[in-house]
Amino acid sequence: MDTAKWPQEFVVKPMNEIVTNTCLKQQSNPPSPATPVERKARPEKDQALNCPRCNSLNTKFCYYNNYSLTQPRYFCKDCRRYWTAGGSLRNIPVGGGVRKNKRSSSNSSSSSPSSSSSSKKPLFANNNTPTPPLPHLNPKIGEAAATKVQDLTFSQGFGNAHEVKDLNLAFSQGFGIGHNHHSSIPEFLQVVPSSSMKNNPLVSTSSSLELLGISSSSASSNSRPAFMSYPNVHDSSVYTASGFGLSYPQFQEFMRPALGFSLDGGDPLRQEEGSSGTNNGRPLLPFESLLKLPVSSSSTNSGGNGNLKENNDEHSDHEHEKEEGEADQSVGFWSGMLSAGASAAASGGSWQ
């Protein structure tokens, strides 16, 4: 078709004609009633079917199996079983009855493992069970074991208690060594019974003084304490009794007192063995460094002239008087021995 012929075939109609034509068509053709949608209703059975198991008429239609019209499914209310028309019968119960049976069976199965587990031995031991008593918790066993260990120790080290005494060791006199473990406690550490302390109130004070080496009679008088004194170091029997002889030079340094200050009487090794033991070996504390001794310039400048020496002497006398005045106000120092004895009084110790 050519494009030149288009205006001739398609004629534009006026608007009024279009409106009038549509109105006339609506009046001539009344609206037809709406047709209902056709549904395929479920086929209702006029009469109930007999149950293939119990021949009961108490049955009902349930649904179509697999949405197929050829497999209607029914349910029997008496035997509570389902069946499908055209299908095979199954003896497996379906529905609520099966669920009830499953619940009862599950309860019975859960109770049986619990009973079997209770009858078996538990895998882990209970922590609350009391542990058997250990031997070291029993005091009798502990004392017997301590006694055996002590006897074994002394028997291995020394062989016998008599051998220890024969060695004349320093601890053989202070500590009792025997088979009884109570005898190894030093006598000055033994506790005084409370009954004796109640009866005699002076027992506690006397025992404490005896611990320090001070007797009750000497404590009343102003005597020096026993623990401040040292044994007579001039006597050579102290060293020979301990198993060390003066003839052994390797023990000479060991026998020297390892103190930071000197003892009264000097070195015992340098004295003669036959010297009388009048000195008690009291310690001398290093108070010499605390004393303020005036230093005169005359000792340093011995070669100076006479005028300078006289001036220095006057200056030193003035400083000495000043120091004596200050010493009267301050605490004095004892230049002698720590404990005043007969030898100390003879040596001329005095307060400064």
Curated annotation (Swiss-Prot):
Q: Where does Zn(2+) bind?
A: 51, 54, 76, 79
Per the record, the zinc finger regions (Dof-type) lie at: 49-103
GO MF entry, a single one: zinc ion binding
Q: Name one GO cellular component term.
A: nucleus
Q: Locations of Basic and acidic residues compositional bias? A: 37-46, 310-323
Q: Which UniProt keywords apply?
A: DNA-binding, Metal-binding, Nucleus, Transcription, Transcription regulation, Zinc, Zinc-finger
Q: Where is the composition biased (Low complexity)?
A: 104-129
A biological process from GO: regulation of DNA-templated transcription
Q: Where is this region: Disordered?
A: 24-46, 93-136, 265-334
Supply the name of the protein.
Dof zinc finger protein DOF1.8
Main function: Transcription factor that binds specifically to a 5'-AA[AG]G-3' consensus core sequence.
Q: Which organism is it from?
A: Arabidopsis thaliana
Q: Where in the cell is it found?
A: Nucleus
